[in-house]
Amino acid sequence: MIPIVIEESGRGERAFDIYSRLLRERIIFLGEAVTSDSANRIVAQMLFLEAEDPEKDIYLYINSPGGSVYDGLGIFDTMQHIKPDVHTVCVGLAASMGAFLLCAGTKGKRSSLQHSRIMIHQPLGGARGQASDIRIQADEILYLKERLNQELSDRTGQPLDRIQQDTDRDFFMSPGEAVEYGLIDSVIDKRPIQAVE
């Protein structure tokens, strides 16, 4: 069930689902596995927000166990394609493709809440069928592994061989460790205090 928010104005009351209300504030929430449905929604929201105001930042909050590499790369490419900077924030878990998208935010604008967990690993896949079909699938997984590792290396500043070693198995990090690794830029422990005027 999606929560509904009621807003009152001089013209009466309006009801919004919580995600639509957040979108008005330029906040997108990835709170599930990366699938074609979730990726299409996120890409559409990013394109909409860019059309609304190409100069204003977008905020992508991530609580995701990961998911489809192809669909995640669609989100990644959109993040790089649009004009607004994309702040990424881990809330809970950013694992696998979730961690990749967390790292894909604009440099200097990638963060995590203090008790979140971040995990990187190599792409997973399976194949069945004739030997030639299995080889095609294995080659594709190896290609994706190389592509993702190179992007992580470019974005974290870690040498490619370190990324290859660390993604060979599940590699969990605290937010502080993710900052040291270069996956994110800061840990959020509390909201900044607003000046009173």
Swiss-Prot record:
Listed GO MF terms: ATP-dependent peptidase activity; ATPase binding; serine-type endopeptidase activity
Role according to the record: Cleaves peptides in various proteins in a process that requires ATP hydrolysis. Has a chymotrypsin-like activity. Plays a major role in the degradation of misfolded proteins.
EC numbers, comma separated: 3.4.21.92
Active-site residue numbers: S96, H121
Protein family: Belongs to the peptidase S14 family.
Keywords, in A-Z order: Cytoplasm, Hydrolase, Protease, Serine protease
Gene, per the UniProt record: clpP2
Catalytic activities: Hydrolysis of proteins to small peptides in the presence of ATP and magnesium. alpha-casein is the usual test substrate. In the absence of ATP, only oligopeptides shorter than five residues are hydrolyzed (such as succinyl-Leu-Tyr-|-NHMec, and Leu-Tyr-Leu-|-Tyr-Trp, in which cleavage of the -Tyr-|-Leu- and -Tyr-|-Trp bonds also occurs)
Quaternary structure and partners: Fourteen ClpP subunits assemble into 2 heptameric rings which stack back to back to give a disk-like structure with a central cavity, resembling the structure of eukaryotic proteasomes.
GO biological process, one term: protein quality control for misfolded or incompletely synthesized proteins
Source superkingdom: Bacteria
Protein name: ATP-dependent Clp protease proteolytic subunit 2
Subcellular location, principal: cytoplasm
NCBIfam families: clpP (TIGR00493), PRK00277.1 (NF001368), PRK12551.1 (NF009203), PRK12553.1 (NF009205)
Keyword Kinase belongs to the record: no
Pfam families reported for this sequence: CLP_protease (PF00574)
Species of provenance: Parasynechococcus marenigrum (strain WH8102)
The keyword Cytoplasm is assigned to this record: yes
Subcellular location: Cytoplasm
